[in-house]
């Protein structure tokens, strides 16, 4: 996972910190303080905690998707922690709680993909430093009640989930900061793809709290909504022709029309346009249980895990 010192001038060592923990898979039945790096499962959620060992930081897992952390890292300390899923996916993620940093810290939906290797952030709140200041701005997105600035940044020879590598970071940084709400991740994944920023197969995905040379506290709860999709409607139509021609149909969300052409006999019928994903929405992939049709555009596979309406 990324060290907050990573991007641009103010961020020099960076990312992949969450990739560094040894592969300890610890099932914790009771709440307990964690002060050394580890990953595991707790109450049905994947969790990850990493610290560089400087300063003071204490992480605790709570019931279901709840976790808390207190830190005082002014002397060079760096940590990242949170709960979520492994693997992640395009899904609506709800979160709530308190995030009270004093200095440089992030609250984000954070994850990795492979093929290509990508580290991504949907940054919902941050402390004294906006990491976008050191990255390349590629566009904007409006989602979940706010505009987000989209950035891309390349990490060269930095820690990652597959070891030291060169890889891209994708960022969406929310303009109206918040500590509670729902993130429609498919909107971000689709917006990134529209700028040529494609994801691969999902690795872990968590609600993350990070702090670098700062102090503060956070108590957060994360939960999953439905897999992200969009667009609904219904319609019916029919078409007929005489002679040996053929019928054709056009269906859009909410309405459809059918036409028949030719000099023989033919017919076409328009079907339902309901329950189809909107443009940029997810429409397929391994394990996907949502809509597999598109109300606009064509369903195209990005990889075995993710197809979207383009």
Swiss-Prot record:
Chief location category: secreted
Enzyme Commission code(s) on record: 3.2.1.8
Reaction(s) catalysed by this chain's protein: Endohydrolysis of (1->4)-beta-D-xylosidic linkages in xylans
Presence of keyword Signal: yes
Gly residues composition-biased segments: 228-246, 257-274
Low complexity bias spans: 218-227, 247-256
GO BP term, pick one: xylan catabolic process
Pathway entry: Glycan degradation; xylan degradation
Keywords on record: Carbohydrate metabolism, Glycosidase, Hydrolase, Polysaccharide degradation, Secreted, Signal, Xylan degradation
pH dependence: Optimum pH is 5.0.
An example Gene Ontology molecular-function term: endo-1,4-beta-xylanase activity
Induction: Induced by soluble xylo-oligosaccharides, with beechwood xylan being the best inducer.
Protein's name in the database: Endo-1,4-beta-xylanase B
């Amino acid at each position: 996972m990324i060290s907050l010192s990573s991007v641009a001038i103010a961020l020099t060592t960076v990312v992949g910190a969450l990739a560094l923990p040894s592969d300890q898979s610890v099932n914790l039945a009771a709440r307990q303080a964690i002060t050394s790096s580890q990953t595991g499962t707790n109450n049905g959620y994947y969790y990850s905690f990493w610290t560089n060992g400087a300063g003071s930081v204490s992480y605790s897992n709570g019931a279901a998707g709840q976790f808390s952390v207190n830190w005082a890292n002014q002397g060079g300390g760096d940590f990242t922690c949170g709960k979520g899923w492994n693997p992640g996916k395009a899904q609506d993620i709800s979160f709530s709680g308190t995030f009270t940093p004093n200095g440089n810290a992030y609250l984000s939906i954070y994850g990795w993909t492979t093929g290509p290797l990508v580290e991504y952030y949907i940054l919902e709140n941050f402390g004294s430093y906006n990491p976008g200041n050191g990255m390349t701005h590629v566009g904007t997105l409006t989602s979940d009640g706010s505009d987000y600035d989209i950035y891309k940044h390349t990490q060269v020879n930095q820690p990652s989930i597959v070891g030291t590598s060169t890889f891209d970071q994708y960022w969406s940084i929310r303009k109206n900061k918040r500590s509670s709400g729902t993130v429609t991740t498919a909107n971000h994944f689709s917006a990134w793809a529209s700028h040529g920023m494609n994801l691969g197969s999902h690795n872990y995905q968590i609600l993350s709290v990070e702090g670098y040379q700062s102090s503060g506290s956070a108590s957060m709860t994360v939960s999953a909504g439905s897999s992200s999709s969009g667009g609904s409607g219904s319609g019916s139509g029919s078409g007929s022709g005489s002679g040996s021609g053929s019928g054709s149909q056009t269906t859009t969300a909410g309405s459809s029309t059918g036409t028949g052409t030719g000099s023989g006999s033919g017919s076409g019928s328009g079907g339902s346009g309901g329950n189809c994903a909107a443009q940029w929405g997810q429409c397929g992939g391994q394990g996907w249980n949502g809509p597999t049709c598109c109300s606009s555009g064509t369903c195209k596979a990005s990889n075995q895990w993710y197809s979207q309406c383009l």
